[in-house]
Amino acid sequence: MVYRGFGLEHISPPVNKPFAEMTPEEQGERGAQMMMEFMTSCPGKSAISGVTGFALGGVFGLFMASMAYDTPLHTPAPVGAGPGAGIPGAPTLQQMADLPLKQQIKIQFADMGRRAYSSAKNFGYIGMIYSGVECTIESLRAKNDLYNGVAAGCLTGGGLAYKSGPSAALIGCAGFAAFSTAIDLYMRSENGRPPKNDFDE
């Protein structure tokens, strides 16, 4: 008997069984595979970045609002200012001082919640757009290098600032591109050449 080798023609493709006919182990593997495929796709990356950015933005906004103890309620109207000064509907400094402590705490927490939600929306929106644009550029170029982040940062920054005029769009493009380049350089710095031996640091 002559040995004819082992090639791809001898391999039968896996049977694509319906999900209901799979064993529990096969269903778990299929579910994990579908989850990984979604997470590595452009819509999945955009969704994950948006949710992560929303959470981080909320924490950041809450922290910044809690540190603004010297200017409560952002920029409240000074004592004796007209009715149109400061935040509409916000009490003045004198009015805040005259309120009971419980009411002051309630107003401050409401303001912190508004600032945290606003920051969360901005961070989530930026993260979702940037991740989606970068994934699309990477898919079109079929390359994973530094230029994807630069182009995505420029398009994201310019797109978010285009309503303010060409100058603002150009500044936003340059700023986001520089920031994304710095982050990519830092993240890729660990992927340099390995040391010549185990003793090189």
Swiss-Prot record:
List cellular component terms (GO).
TIM22 mitochondrial import inner membrane insertion complex
Give the UniProt subcellular location, in the record's own words.
Answer: Mitochondrion inner membrane
GO molecular function terms noted in the UniProt entry: mitochondrion targeting sequence binding; protein transmembrane transporter activity; structural molecule activity
How is it placed in the membrane, per its record?
Multi-pass membrane protein
> Which stretches are transmembrane?
47-67, 146-162, 167-187
Q: List the disulfide bonds.
A: 42-135, 154-173
Q: Which GO terms describe its biological process?
A: protein insertion into mitochondrial inner membrane
The UniProt keywords, alphabetically, are:
Disulfide bond, Membrane, Mitochondrion, Mitochondrion inner membrane, Protein transport, Translocation, Transmembrane, Transmembrane helix, Transport
Task: Establish whether keyword Disulfide bond is in the entry.
Answer: yes
The main location is mitochondrion
Family that this chain belongs to: Belongs to the Tim17/Tim22/Tim23 family.
Functional summary from the UniProt entry: Essential core component of the TIM22 complex, a complex that mediates the import and insertion of multi-pass transmembrane proteins into the mitochondrial inner membrane. In the TIM22 complex, it constitutes the voltage-activated and signal-gated channel. Forms a twin-pore translocase that uses the membrane potential as external driving force in 2 voltage-dependent steps.
Q: How does it assemble?
A: Component of the TIM22 complex, whose core is composed of TIM22 and TIM54, associated with the 70 kDa heterohexamer composed of TIM9 and TIM10 (or TIM8 and TIM13).
Q: Per its record, how is this protein called by name?
A: Mitochondrial import inner membrane translocase subunit TIM22
Say which species the protein is native to: Eremothecium gossypii (strain ATCC 10895 / CBS 109.51 / FGSC 9923 / NRRL Y-1056) (Yeast)
Which gene specifies this protein's sequence? Answer: TIM22
